[in-house]
Amino acid sequence: MIDVELNDEGQFLSSEQLQLVKDVLNHAAQEVSLSQQSEVSVTFTTEEDIHELNREHRGIDRPTDVLSFALNDETSDFDPTFHEELGLPNLLGDIVISVPHVERQAADYGHSFERELAFLVVHGFLHLLGYDHMNEEEEKQMFTKQEEILQSYGLGRSES
């Protein structure tokens, strides 16, 4: 099980959509066999705010659809094992999603808002677990896992 902290101060999403985010993350955690109790936060924001975060943290001066900030990565001094020793959940990190991007991309790809939302949630979650798409092999592995999770949840490309 994964504890999900949702931050939707702009009240962009309905209660059903927020529940979908929690359900999809718990499903994804099962699909990747995440055995340790973990925690993740998901923030829903504007295009302007995600643009600022992208510029500040990645040096890319444009908005994006989703950003992930893993607490346990190679560049961090953070030691996640102390949580386990104390019986606390493993803090995976933060996912930030641009709601205007969800709306636009759902329309562009011809599927539902919920399918696009779930896609970006799973994409961000996999980044927190160390998946990436910096080269062709990594991209294939990550995107295959992403689609498997969405398909098994019932939000595959043909089902949305």
Curated annotation (Swiss-Prot):
InterPro entries: MetalPrtase_cat_dom_sf_prd (IPR023091), YbeY (IPR002036), YbeY_CS (IPR020549). HAMAP family: Endoribonucl_YbeY. Zn(2+) binds at H123, H127, H133. PANTHER family: ENDORIBONUCLEASE YBEY, CHLOROPLASTIC. GO terms for molecular function: metalloendopeptidase activity; RNA endonuclease activity; zinc ion binding. One of its GO terms (biological process) is rRNA processing. This is Endoribonuclease YbeY. It is found in: Cytoplasm. Binds 1 zinc ion. Its EC number is 3.1.-.-. Single strand-specific metallo-endoribonuclease involved in late-stage 70S ribosome quality control and in maturation of the 3' terminus of the 16S rRNA. Belongs to the endoribonuclease YbeY family. GO terms for cellular component: cytoplasm. Its cofactor is Zn(2+).
